[in-house]
Amino acid sequence: LGFCFGGRYAHLCAARLGVNAAAALHGTKIGLHLNETDRITCPVSYHFGDQDTSIPMEEVNAIKAAYANHPNAEIAIYEGCAHNFSTPGKPAYVEEIAKISRDAVLRCFKSM
C-alpha cells in the first residue's frame, strides 16, 4: 500500500517482487513504470483525484489504459478531488472519498 510517492513502490513491488496485492492512493510516478504492468498478476487498487496537480490526468489515463486488460485491477478517479484526498488533516481531505477508497483497498486485499 503506497500513498503519494509510495504508489510508485507499490506498483514496482507488484511487478518485481510478486506481492499478493497492491494499492495506491494518490500515487505518484507510477506512470514511469507502466512498461512493467504486464508482469503484474495480483489484484491492484489505485485511486486518484481528477484535480491532483501532482499526478497529471494524462498519467492517470495512461495507467488506466495499461491495466485495461488486467482482470483484477481497479483504477478509480474521484471527481473534484486533489492530492491527499484520503489523508486526514490535509486541506484536500474528503472524508466520504477517503472511506470509499479505503473500503476498495480492503476489498482488494481480501481478494488475494
Label each residue range with its predicted role.
Residues 1-112:
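N-terminal cap/leader regions of alpha/beta-hydrolase-fold enzymes
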